[in-house]
């Protein structure tokens, strides 16, 4: 049975202060109607429905004309993001009305620029597909018909003049873990989209999130007790980084793309209207109707409430106010960080408390400032919440700093000789030991095209826009609101929402919060039943390989071209035993322990090789000398140099440095401080975190 959709008047909202005049929306005599992807109406349909279907043909020209405001608003949002038609762009396409509407607008935007280029350039030749635009359909493989649907969507996107490809998902256990299907599917989907963008040298990915999605996320986070930063919803522009560094032919680099959501000013109804007005078909995902998922339950509740007065418009005003506050917080923490934080080459940060002046920084900005520093140092990208957030705030405001604190994967203490005016932020050894196998990995030398350089220029333009926007704002509504309830009450006091909207939001919050608590207990019980200790995988490194230790240090072992000329004994008859063992095998990577610098001191203090070999109390970490005085003299010189470097590094930071050992546990190399047991070991370590400070660029305009 075909389903008809009614298209009413078009009233897109635009908050980006553009200068595009919106033309008056024509009111057709008969509202245009359009079928979704259902079969065409047949003779067996009632006469009234058949007449309604046929009337679309007579009003399609009017509907097409009425899409002008959408095209203008889309172009304005893209310009606000610093993105121009000449940029190479990918579009995430599911085949639903949202992503198909995005394809319609992106295609028209690109084509308009192409027509202008054709008019300005002699001999311009257009291709079958829109230049610099790629649609990507991710087939999750969770339903039997998903492959057929993916091919159908791909063909429809190509029919619009947009090149499109399908990315299939492979699940280790056949499908995601029960209870986490949506989260797992989302994670895999973005990973597939990211991989294709990197492979195709595309720096921008468009996603079709709209204002109704923002309202759903607002209620969802409200039920989880999120503060104002979480209630700000999804970023307009954000940076997404690959989980692994990649090789560009010369060096290992951090690869990433810009995730742009240009449809946040449009509603779900607008998505249908754009598809209808462009005669574009779509599919409906049946899982969107399942009440198993919180998003779907919230969507249904919002749909029921949206018919009552000004409820939905009040919610959107509240979200806009939260986004304004978030923009201010991001601007403020960046300004403070530039003045008060130093990042050292050994992988730790130093906070200057006198320059920070934490007693005069509001809780919201200071919490975000500290959260970003801790996430950067630990490369543990989880939000700082609850007790941890309160602990770190109290700690940083205690001046002078005298105590130590372990929180969120980091160890904080007073910097030596600073009299408590500076705080060290180092990666926690406990966190490293529990997570080393998860976030340490060998790097692949499969060559990738260089990262897209134009991203830097886009980010620069976006930062200028955001800074100018926030500097022109004198009132910030929720800077001092500490909880979601505080935000709601403040919004009521400021007349952002009325009493009715406040009451309904509190009801939605309580209703979904109760379901969340019940589900959390179920998941906790399930997780306890399924608890298994992770395998204790040891990260090993062979000659010619590179690894990323804790996603923080890039360690590269270059094999020497002519080992025999480098590593011969004084009598030039045979190689040192220690070099032969390690250069023909592999080394294990671990973090530094206190005994390691004691070992370096012992090596420097030993008077002779013979005494070292005959001492039964010698450290187990000592290297066998094998009657190699030349090597031992080099070993002592290297240990002495390493100790000099080590003295400039605080003890807490030393413990996070990478150490390489052989199979017997003997220390072979500590590359960060220049120690190696033999000159033939060409190993170096560079602090190169996977994600930069602040998690990359984001905009909430």
List the model feature ranges, each with a label.
Residues 2-12, 21-26, 31, 69-75, ...:
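AMP-forming adenylation/ATP pyrophosphatase catalytic core
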Residues 117, 121, 200, 230-233, ...:
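Residue-level detector of alpha-helical recognition elements and their boundaries
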Residues 161, 306, 377-381:
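Eukaryotic basic, amphipathic alpha-helical target segments in cytosolic regions
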Residues 207, 286, 290, 314, ...:
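Short, surface-exposed helix-loop/turn micro-motifs enriched in polar/charged residues
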Residues 214, 314, 365-369:
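Residue-level detector of well-ordered alpha-helical segments, enriched
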């Amino acid at each position: 049975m075909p389903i008809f959709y009614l298209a009413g008047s078009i009233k897109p909202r635009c908050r980006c202060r553009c200068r595009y005049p919106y033309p008056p929306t024509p009111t057709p005599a008969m509202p245009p109607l359009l079928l979704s992807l259902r079969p065409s109406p047949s003779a067996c349909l009632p006469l009234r429905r058949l007449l309604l279907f046929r009337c679309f043909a007579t009003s399609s020209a009017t509907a097409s004309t009425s899409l002008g405001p959408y095209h203008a608003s889309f172009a304005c949002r893209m310009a606000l993001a610093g993105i121009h038609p000449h940029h190479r762009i990918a579009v995430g396409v599911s085949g639903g009305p949202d992503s198909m509407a995005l394809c319609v607008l992106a295609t028209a935007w690109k084509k308009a620029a192409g027509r202008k280029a054709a008019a300005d350039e002699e001999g311009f030749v257009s291709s079958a597909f829109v230049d610099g635009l790629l649609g990507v359909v991710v087939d999750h493989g969770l339903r039997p018909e998903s492959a057929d649907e993916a091919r159908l969507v791909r063909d429809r996107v190509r029919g619009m003049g947009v090149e499109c490809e399908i990315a299939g998902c492979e699940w280790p256990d056949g499908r995601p873990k029960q209870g986490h299907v949506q989260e797992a599917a989302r994670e895999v989907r973005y990973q597939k989209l990211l991989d294709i963008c990197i492979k195709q040298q595309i720096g921008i990915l468009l996603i079709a999130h709209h204002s109704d999605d923002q309202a759903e996320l607002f209620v969802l986070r409200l039920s989880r007790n999120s503060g104002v930063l979480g209630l700000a919803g999804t970023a307009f522009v954000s940076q997404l980084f690959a989980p692994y560094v990649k090789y560009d032919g010369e060096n290992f680099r951090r690869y990433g793309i810009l995730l742009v959501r240009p449809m946040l000013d449009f509603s779900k109804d607008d998505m249908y209207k754009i598809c209808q007005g462009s005669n574009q078909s779509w599919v409906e995902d049946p899982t969107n109707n399942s009440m198993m998922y919180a998003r779907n339950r919230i969507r249904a509740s919002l749909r029921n409430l949206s018919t009552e007065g000004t409820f939905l418009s009040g919610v959107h005003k509240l979200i806009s106010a939260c986004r304004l506050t978030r923009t201010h917080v991001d601007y403020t923490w960046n300004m403070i960080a530039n003045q008060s934080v130093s990042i050292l080459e050994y992988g730790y940060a130093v906070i200057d408390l006198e320059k920070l002046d934490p007693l005069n920084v509001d809780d919201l900005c200071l919490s975000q400032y500290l959260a970003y520093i801790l996430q950067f140092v630990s490369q543990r990208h989880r939000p700082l919440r609850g007790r941890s957030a309160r602990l770190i705030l109290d700690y940083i405001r205690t001046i002078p700093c005298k105590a130590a604190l372990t929180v969120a994967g980091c160890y904080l203490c007073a910097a030596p000789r600073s009299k408590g005016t500076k705080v060290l932020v180092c990666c926690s050894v406990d966190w490293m030991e529990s997570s080393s196998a998860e976030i340490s990995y060998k790097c692949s030398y499969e060559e990738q095209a260089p990262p897209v350089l134009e991203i830097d220029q886009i980010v620069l333009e976006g930062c200028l826009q955001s800074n100018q926007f926030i500097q022109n704002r004198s009132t910030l509504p929720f800077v001092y609101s500490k909880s979601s309830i505080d935000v709601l009450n403040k919004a009521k006091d400021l007349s952002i929402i009325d009493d009715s909207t406040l009451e309904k939001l509190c009801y939605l919050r309580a209703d979904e919060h109760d379901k969340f608590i019940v589900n959390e207990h179920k998941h906790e019980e399930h997780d306890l039943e399924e608890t298994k200790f992770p395998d204790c995988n040891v990260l090993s490194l062979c000659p010619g390989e590179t690894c990323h230790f804790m996603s923080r240090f890039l360690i590269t072992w270059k094999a020497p071209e002519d080992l025999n000329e480098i590593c011969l004994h004084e009598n030039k008859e045979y190689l040192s035993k220690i070099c032969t063992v390690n250069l023909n095998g592999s080394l294990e990577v671990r973090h530094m322990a206190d005994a390691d610098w004691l070992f370096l001191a012992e090596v420097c203090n030993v008077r002779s090789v013979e005494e070292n070999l005959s001492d039964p109390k010698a450290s187990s970490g000592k290297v066998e000398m094998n009657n190699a005085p030349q090597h031992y003299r080099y070993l002592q010189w290297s240990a002495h140099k390493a100790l000099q470097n080590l003295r400039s590094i605080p003890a807490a930071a030393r413990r996070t440095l990478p150490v390489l050992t052989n199979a017997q546990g003997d220390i072979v190399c500590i590359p960060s401080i220049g120690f190696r047991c033999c000159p033939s070991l060409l190993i170096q370590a560079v602090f190169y975190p996977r994600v930069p400070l602040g998690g990359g660029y984001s905009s909430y305009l």
